[in-house]
Amino acid sequence: MTMLKDPSKKYRAFPTIELPDRTWPSKTITEAPIWCSSDLRDGNQSLIEPMDSEKKLRFWKTLVQVGVKEIEASFPSASQTDFDFVRTLIEDGHIPDDTTIQVLTQAREDLIARTFESLRGAKKAIVHLYNATSPSFRRIVFNQDKQGVKDIAVNAAKLFVKYAAQQPETQWTFQYSPETFSATELEFAKEVCDAVIEVWNPTPEHKVILNLPATVEVATPNIYADQIEWFCRNISRRDSVIISLHCHNDRGTGIAATELGLMAGADRAEGCLFGNGERTGNVDLVTLALNLYTQGIDPQLDFSDIDGVRKVVEECNQLPVHPRHPYVGDLVHTAFSGSHQDAIRKGFAKQQDGELWEVPYLPIDPADIGRSYEAVIRVNSQSGKGGITYLLEQEYGISLPRRMQIEFSQVVQGETDRLGLEMTAQQIYSLLHKEYLQANSPYALVSHRLQEENGHSAVEVEVAGEGETTLHWRGKGNGALEALVAGLPIAVEIMDYNEHAIGAGTNAKAAAYIELRVAGGRPVHGVGIDENITTASFKALFSALNRSLSQQEAKAA
């Protein structure tokens, strides 16, 4: 089957909204919305392998640290795992006083009862009700008319009131989503929401949340903005309602739709870090927040250590962040083009502390989000007749990880500037060997002994220190590297680890690469090569540790 010559025979354009006096095009966003993360619910349910409780708790703590104040934690009636996770958050005191847990439920009494039970003992909570309202869902999925769909929402809303009254110690906030709102007739969406509002009887002091999802993107962002503005104008008790957005990215315009929706009068935005979620993902809260930041607006979220946040998200979701993802990708602050490099260099030369940021090609100062300037101006691979990475792979079988390519290119650039000549593959390898493989000071690995028992590792290393001293470090952990890290006298964090074989057969060696952060400093890479993969990984860690300490010493001097 091929694409149709006349797609109008199969697809139709979404109708425009009759709103000739729309005001949102002349509006600007002047403050951050209320943020709600759906990573642990919408994001988690879309993963090939959903997070276990340990990963979910790690993710929760990261969201709290970033500053998200409303977090949709689970679908507690869907599984015992989700129910138990909510109980863990409440019973073990993981919910700060300024943070509200949110949970989702369908419109059935047994599921609603189970959901409220999961929240017993919570100081405050948002309970989120939804049912689909669009024509296709009414006709194809549920075989219900408009009245039937409305009755489902109203009856469930009454059950919310009933079960909340049984737990008066909790400060309840009710949220309703007419799922598939953006594909629903506006008058009907308003009718259903008005009926739910009538049951819940909100006040300006105790508001309800109406969440208006673009469950599937069906039109351009301006149409979604028209829908939001029309809804904000016409919904009853607007002063007692928080209008929330929940955009997906099926057409690639989730960010734009959310921003225009905020201009149209919405108060709140739901999404996921780096855009995880069903199909093409939920709107990316990080991009939304940093878009505000680069317009001079405090986003009320802290991404000062964006690489640390990314590390948690990648490990919990088991999905990589694209190298060209806005703000956080490995390549977004990197210029390969000579003209781009020249403009950036001139921008840095003129940029003064305290002045408005005006460096060409860089919409944000990388330092604001914990990035260094070293990756910004980078050697163009084509100028090296194949590039640094290509030469190392082809001539020596060494495949540098992406972020290490960026770091090492700066080392090569410094050498080419010093020599004023093009470097050969042998010269590049010699520089790699000197910079990484010979990084043996102040600590040189002499030997190590590793013991494995019941899935745990215990390691003892002999280290040659400064002044011909001999040191012995011991540590335990879930693996060899974790055990070694536990035995170090310095606090370090492994940000990334990669390994591969060099060659094949009995003469093969192992190459290991570690990205290490020492005492909260800037991440630094290390390399280890050995016949034994464990030894190679230990050498890589010592390489990174020594390089970091040497750089810190040089900076202090």
From Swiss-Prot:
Residue positions binding Mg(2+): 42, 246, 248, 282
Keywords, A to Z, come to: Amino-acid biosynthesis, Branched-chain amino acid biosynthesis, Cytoplasm, Leucine biosynthesis, Magnesium, Metal-binding, Transferase
* Main location per the UniProt record: cytoplasm
Per its record, what are the GO molecular function terms? 2-isopropylmalate synthase activity; acetyl-CoA C-acetyltransferase activity; magnesium ion binding
What is the protein name for this chain? 2-isopropylmalate synthase
Enumerate the spans annotated as Pyruvate carboxyltransferase domain.
Answer: 33-307
- Which pathway does the database say it acts in? Amino-acid biosynthesis; L-leucine biosynthesis; L-leucine from 3-methyl-2-oxobutanoate: step 1/4
Q: Which GO terms describe its cellular component?
A: cytoplasm
- State its cofactor: Mg(2+)
Would you say which domain of life the source belongs to? Bacteria
**Span list, region Regulatory domain:** 439-557
Reactions it catalyzes: 3-methyl-2-oxobutanoate + acetyl-CoA + H2O = (2S)-2-isopropylmalate + CoA + H(+)
Q: Does the keyword DNA repair apply?
A: no
Report the record's Gene Ontology biological process terms: L-leucine biosynthetic process
HAMAP family under this entry? Answer: LeuA_type2
Q: Which CDD domains match?
A: DRE_TIM_LeuA (cd07942)
Q: Which organism is it from?
A: Pseudomonas putida (strain W619)
Q: Which Pfam families match?
A: HMGL-like (PF00682), IPMS_D2 (PF22615), LeuA_dimer (PF08502)
Among NCBIfam families, the record links this protein to: leuA_yeast (TIGR00970), PRK03739.1 (NF002991)
